[in-house]
């Protein structure tokens, strides 16, 4: 099995405690279904309560398992069309090759990326290249794993300017119920997170970040509590006194309701708080 995470997935458990179960300032509906022929359909709609703006997207996915191929098509209300073709675990176990294209009919703009990733038990590597003959940007990352320790590097190189535009490092440790993650971005942004699964019902997370040459330190704590197998409560707070609360209820198999609220602790009586409603249906 290929268990080494990608660079973007380092510290994912802590991020999930902070991000999942919330949807401040919007009404969101997600629908997922699968046809008899194996085509997967998913659609999502958002309506933002402060601006009244609404947006949505539609995605279809079809897998040809015998050949390791996956075809994905995407459309959103900004009239952007996307097509993705991936080929996985056929040329070599853990190797995935992807062609990702985007087309905007209104402007005629076209863009694309070639992606490759290779994952094994002790390492994972990957690279993306923009399809741009004027000077593509090359993205790359690598993660090494040894007895629970993880070390990662991420970079991007602008060939048009012959300049390294991104230079990130990460170091962490992962156990069954505990994760530690630290990172440095471009030598100026520093951050870290701690994830702890206290027991089967309680998950906690701490997040800390700061920027060199600035006094702006960001700090937050979050927790998730499972009331039962169908109901969970989430809460988080940061050093800006923003308090987030979330309630998730599985009404029946495949039907989930999420209620959330963001409270400004510094200006509690002034208003400006945000609420959110989410509805997920899978059939």
Swiss-Prot record:
* Glycyl lysine isopeptide (Lys-Gly) (interchain with G-Cter in ubiquitin) crosslink site(s): 53, 61, 109-110, 163, 266, 274
Q: Does the keyword Plastid apply?
A: no
Cite the Gene3D superfamilies for this sequence.
Answer: Porin
Instruction: Give TM segment ranges.
Output: 26-35, 39-47, 54-64, 69-76, 80-89, 95-104, 111-120, 123-130, 137-145, 150-158, 163-175, 178-185, 189-198, 202-211, 218-227, 231-238, 242-251, 254-263, 273-282
Q: Domain remarks in the entry?
A: Consists mainly of a membrane-spanning beta-barrel formed by 19 beta-strands.
PANTHER family with a match to the protein in the record: VOLTAGE-DEPENDENT ANION-SELECTIVE CHANNEL (PTHR11743), VOLTAGE-DEPENDENT ANION-SELECTIVE CHANNEL PROTEIN 3 (PTHR11743:SF28)
Name of the protein in its database record: Non-selective voltage-gated ion channel VDAC3
Protein species of origin: Homo sapiens
